[in-house]
A protein has these predicted regions:
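Eukaryotic intrinsically disordered, low-complexity regulatory linkers and tails enriched in Ser/Thr/Pro
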Residues: 1-92
Length: 92
């Protein structure tokens, strides 16, 4: 399992909170840069106290019959490395 910081923004604009989420790397279908969140951060309207240079990644997870997606703090390569390193540890 990999710990990521999930952005909670139910209305798609201002971030209401941040929360930890643990993801099984085996269930991640793909990851992609969340350009909308990056644009909001660059405009300074995302979240008080969050550095505007942060990158954001949308994580798409297969939950067995349905797909769930959410945005986490971190660039695509950073998140990919976390997922990859976790898989290597799990496989021994």
């Amino acid at each position: 399992m990999v710990k990521l910081i999930k952005i909670v923004n139910p209305h798609g604009t201002k971030v209401e909170s941040l929360t930890e989420v643990y993801v099984n790397p085996e269930h991640v279908s793909y990851i992609v840069e969340d350009e909308q969140m990056t644009n909001l951060a660059n405009q300074g309207i995302i979240f008080d106290g969050l550095h505007p240079n942060y990158k954001f990644t949308r994580v798409i997870v297969d939950t067995g019959g349905r797909t769930e997606h959410f945005t986490v703090i971190g660039g695509v390569s950073e998140i990919a490395n976390k997922l990859k390193n976790s898989k290597q540890l799990l496989r021994g």
